[in-house]
Amino acid sequence: MANPKSEYDVIIVGGGLNGLATGAYLQKAGLSVGIFERRDESGTFCATEEVLFPGVKLNLHASLLVTHFGPAMVDLELEKFGLELCKPAGAEYGYFYPFLDGNAAMFAHYDARKTYEMWQRISPKDAETYRKVANFLGPRQDVILQQALCSKHTDESFLQFLDEFSDVPVFPKDWLFMSGFEFVENLFEHEQIRVGLLSSAAMAADDLKSRLAGPLSILAALCGFTSNFYTARGGSHDVVHALVRCFVLHGGKIFYNCPVEKIIIEDKKAKGIVLSSISCYPDAEFKAGKAVISDLSAQTTFLGLVGEEHLSVSARASLKRYDYRGGTLFTNYYVMNERPDFACAQKFPEANNTYSFNFGAETVDQAADLFDRCDVRGVLPDPPVAWGGCANYCIADPTQAPPGMYTVMSWCFVPYKLNSLGGPGAWDDIRESYADKAEEVLVQYLPNLKTAKVARYVNTPHDYVRRNAHSFGNMHPSGATTEAQMWSWKPFAGCDAPRTPIDSLYICQSMGMSNFTHLGAAYVAASELMGDLGIERPDWWRAKAMDGAKELWRREGVERRTSVD
């Protein structure tokens, strides 16, 4: 067996999106980087596979891409490496929520005035409230995103972040101490506006009943951050391909089939890694001259690879109660032989050309029951409710199915553990029966699914865990985003993420806000490490949040309008 190079400036544990992006930044900047991945493929939660039949490409997790939000799309030249983000041609709306009476809450892709005009059709008074909020927050959107997604989170920066919302005209003074539900019910009057907004915000937060995280997710929806999703040409995995190409072109090395057994800690400093006995290089040690970075979740990194003996009592206590609940997804994929035709398109024809949607709950009470069942009681919602972010893939990218066919995905919120049924293994027993129930609900909103369905594929929460065990059932390996677990106190107070209490050990996962495909965690981790090493960032490392989006919209020929007036 040939012996590989055994020392790198930086070793990254895990070849997920943020691990790849962190590595690409550092390798492009001149450091030598080795990435060690457990599986035989990078980007476990950004996979695209032909699991049904040839030509049907199913995105087996990440589907609502926001890579254009973060700096990496520009800094790493991801489009040069093959990434092509797609939305439906001519689409003006990015998200909608249908109701059984034929109404729909529509959220514009890039123009706040279009959202305002659609809301006027349902509730003129609520539309005026939205106008006041959008006019205030619109000019601040890029600053808000830079602070939330692409900056190191500290207690001080959190207070600065909150200052951006201190004078919003219609906000209750105590909005931070409200749940997401209470916040929405204080701002808006019409039930359908409330439910539509909550459903949009649910894609950004694990628990809308949480204080702080709940209302902040409502803000994300009001700013249009949850109605600005894309797919990628050929499927979500194209993001992974672009990152790998960038990393490898600049000289980076990826070790596949190489699970890491432990991080070497000497004198309270991370010095390298030891591979598992079942890796391609059994029990091999690799040294890190400058840093080790973990792209794994908090418990796996600290309690597993680092070891409790290297952690303080307070850190151990925080990590043992780390919250992975919420955001658990049950997924139906459909192949149809005609374009999806939603019932609400009779009144709102724009829905049929909108990429993302949710469905199921018709009232705020039903929505609250969804979170109560999933996060508090641990029982299955019946009937199912899809609030995880559904996708109408092929109206945006026809290459994801054979000619004349369309793929649609529904993400239902569910509990993971199913303790009342004997544990997570019960998902194997109820997979098809629960999928049938979810389909029965969807047909009420998408009636031609019944006659146009060619095939269905089901992914349970347990299937996701089998693919990526360190997610622990959450849609994000970074864990839940709640008032106790976000910003500078995630993964635990005093961690100082992306730094850790272990010298030269960094994380690019399980920190700040939710780790979506904007790659902000990678940007922050790489930036902070460069600063700690005293290395000036190269001239190409200068992009800000939304720079990629602005260029994308310029080429699409659309004018972004963040305010109504």
Swiss-Prot record:
Pathway: Terpene metabolism; monoterpene degradation. It catalyses: (4S)-limonene + A + H2O = (4S)-perillyl alcohol + AH2; (4R)-limonene + A + H2O = (4R)-perillyl alcohol + AH2. Its cofactor is FAD. It is found in: Cytoplasm. Its EC number is 1.17.99.8. Optimum pH is 7.5-8.0. Keywords: Cytoplasm, FAD, Flavoprotein, Oxidoreductase. Involved in the degradation of the cyclic monoterpene limonene. Catalyzes the oxidation of limonene at the primary methyl group, forming perillyl alcohol. Hydroxylates the R- and S-enantiomers to their respective enantiomeric form of perillyl alcohol at a similar rate. Native CtmAB oxidizes a wide range of monocyclic monoterpenes containing the allylic methyl group motif (1-methyl-cyclohex-1-ene). Can also catalyze the reverse reaction, the reduction of perillyl alcohol to limonene, but with lower efficiency. Cannot use molecular oxygen as an electron acceptor. Heterodimer composed of CtmA and CtmB. Belongs to the carotenoid/retinoid oxidoreductase family. This is Limonene dehydrogenase subunit A.
